Structures are given as C-alpha cells and as structure tokens.
C-alpha cells in the first residue's frame, strides 16, 4: 500500500481563493480593507522569508499588509509601544509578532500585550482559554491547518478515532489537542518524557508529529491505514548540500499510512492560509462589534 500524498499547497490555494472572494465581498459591504500587521525584530534569514511570504499572500487576497522590521537591538519598551500603537490603529485587525525573538526580549510579555481581538496567531492567554472552553477565538494557525486537513479526510467528526500528538508546545501540540477533542477524537499527547512512543503510535489512527527532530517517526511505528500529519521542518546535510525533511521518515511511512503530508508542501502552506483566514475572521468580528 502506498499512501495518498496530501497536497497542502493545493488545499491552501483553494482556501486563499475562498478568502479572496470573501474579502472582496467584505470590502464591498463595509468599505473596510482587512489589515494585517507583522512585526519582525532582527534579521533572522528564515524569519525574513516567512514574513515576506505572509506579506505577499496577504496582499494577493486583498488585505492591507504592513510589515514592521525592527532592529535586533530594539528594547522591550520599544517593541511594546509599537504593539500598543497597532492595537489602537483602526486600519489593523490582525497583529503578528514573528517568533523567535532576540534573547533579550520576553516573548510572553510581548504576546500578552497584543489585543486579544487582534491576536491573529491565537497565542494570547485569553484566546488559549477560549479555545479550551470551545468558544469562538483565534486558533493557532498550524493546528488550524491540520484540523482543516483532517476535516477534508474524515468529515466534521473524529469520534472513535485515536489521535496521537507527538510534541506538547504551546504553538502546535497543546492547541492541536484542544481542536481534536472538539472533533470528538480520543487524544494522547507524547513528549520527551513519554515512554515507548512507538507503541503509542502503532495504536493511533491519526499521528501528528511536531517535535523538531528529523525523521524521528519511523515507518514501522505507523499503524496500517493511519493518517499522518508531519508538522516538522528540519534542514539536514546530505553530502555537501542540505535538504528539508519532516519529523516523520516519509519514504517508509508512506508505505504504511493511508495518507500523509510531505515536507515541504504539506502543513507549511496551510499555516499561512490559516493566518489569512484568521485575519478575515477578526476583521468581520471587529466590524460587527462596531469598534
């Protein structure tokens, strides 16, 4: 058996087309163009690529895109002042601070300063609480992308499905668990202190790998017919070159799984598409609230 390769690029492109159409309707009805502000502190090359792609795709769907590139030596007070200004800017409905931040900046304080109603990444404690309570909120973009893929594969309910999340980060693992529970899956979270992760994998109908360890999950860990979502993005050396691989050993896993996301081209494109989806949702909510 060879798995269906889930094409995240195609699904993300379809989502962007829907967002572009909805955005045009929203602008026509309200006269308001959704505004997404992205703050980048420092000059990390990978972050620069991510930020540039976010800006390009935001403009393609009709958003106002504003990118603020701040020097690496920006102080905590200066960064917080910029966030407060954007909180109060009526043109902006979504604010994102690109992570990781330079070591001298406190990411927790920075993220908590973003207005929860403009928190496009869903990292503010209020939105985290809303997510676990099952209330409307901004959902972190990568877990949301995974959830949309699973809905396309299984439908709205995951009742009776055993889901294993490998990784317990605030960005992916924990919010992913909340989303899976909302879809009625039976959820297990594995992490660095979990014994015998392969045994847990072999019981899972759905495996979501998000630990940042190249090809950690082997093909013989995967239950026959499972759906595997690989969130990892790792650069490894191959001879005198480098290549991107996920947290799953793709070649062996695809011979066992029913469906699997590749790296690159799987979850990555979905993350940016969901950022745009969240931005439009926030724009609509702000408009309805009259703020």
UniProtKB/Swiss-Prot annotation:
Coiled-coil blocks: none
Substrates-to-products reaction catalysed: (6R)-5,10-methylene-5,6,7,8-tetrahydrofolate + NADP(+) = (6R)-5,10-methenyltetrahydrofolate + NADPH; (6R)-5,10-methenyltetrahydrofolate + H2O = (6R)-10-formyltetrahydrofolate + H(+)
CDD domains documented for this protein: NAD_bind_m-THF_DH_Cyclohyd
Keyword NADP among record annotations: yes
GO cellular component: cytosol
Top-level lineage group: Bacteria
EC number: 1.5.1.5, 3.5.4.9
Pathway(s) of this molecule: One-carbon metabolism; tetrahydrofolate interconversion
Cysteines engaged in disulfide bonds, as pairs: none
Keywords: Amino-acid biosynthesis, Histidine biosynthesis, Hydrolase, Methionine biosynthesis, Multifunctional enzyme, NADP, One-carbon metabolism, Oxidoreductase, Purine biosynthesis
InterPro entries membership: Aminoacid_DH-like_N_sf, NAD(P)-bd_dom_sf, THF_DH/CycHdrlase, THF_DH/CycHdrlase_cat_dom, THF_DH/CycHdrlase_CS, THF_DH/CycHdrlase_NAD-bd_dom
An annotated Gene Ontology molecular function: methenyltetrahydrofolate cyclohydrolase activity
UniProt: NADP(+) binding residues: 167-169, 192, 233
UniProt GO BP: L-histidine biosynthetic process; methionine biosynthetic process; purine nucleotide biosynthetic process; tetrahydrofolate interconversion
UniProt record similarity statement: Belongs to the tetrahydrofolate dehydrogenase/cyclohydrolase family.
Quaternary context: Homodimer.
UniProt protein name: Bifunctional protein FolD
Organism, as annotated: Dichelobacter nodosus (strain VCS1703A)
């Amino acid at each position: 058996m060879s798995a269906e390769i889930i094409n995240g690029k195609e699904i993300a492109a379809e989502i962007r087309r829907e967002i572009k159409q909805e955005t045009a309707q929203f602008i026509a009805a309200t006269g308001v163009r959704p505004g997404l502000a992205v703050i980048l502190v420092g000059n990390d090359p990978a972050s620069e690529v991510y930020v540039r792609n976010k800006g390009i795709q935001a403009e393609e769907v009709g958003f106002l895109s504003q990118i603020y590139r701040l020097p690496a030596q920006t102080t905590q007070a200066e960064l917080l002042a910029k966030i407060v200004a954007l909180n109060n800017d009526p043109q902006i409905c979504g604010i994102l601070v690109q992570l990781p931040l330079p070591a001298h900046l406190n990411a927790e304080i920075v993220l908590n300063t973003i207005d929860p109603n403009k928190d496009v990444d869903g990292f503010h404690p209020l939105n985290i609480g809303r997510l676990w309570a099952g209330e409307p909120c901004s959902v972190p973009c990568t877990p949301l992308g995974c959830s949309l893929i699973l809905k396309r594969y299984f439908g709205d309910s995951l009742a009776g499905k055993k889901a294993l999340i490998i990784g317990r980060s605030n960005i992916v693992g924990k919010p992913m668990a909340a989303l899976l529970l909302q879809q009625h899956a039976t959820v297990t979270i594995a992490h660095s202190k979990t014994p015998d992760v392969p045994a847990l994998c072999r019981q899972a109908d759905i495996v979501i790998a998000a630990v940042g360890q190249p090809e950690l999950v082997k093909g013989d860990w995967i239950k026959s017919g499972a759906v595997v979502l690989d969130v990892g993005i790792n650069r490894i050396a191959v001879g005198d070159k480098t290549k991107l691989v996920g947290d799953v050993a793709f070649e062996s896993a695809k011979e066992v799984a029913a469906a699997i996301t590749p790296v690159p081209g799987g979850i990555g494109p979905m993350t940016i598409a969901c950022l745009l989806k969240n931005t439009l949702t926030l724009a609509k909510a702000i408009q309805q609230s009259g703020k």
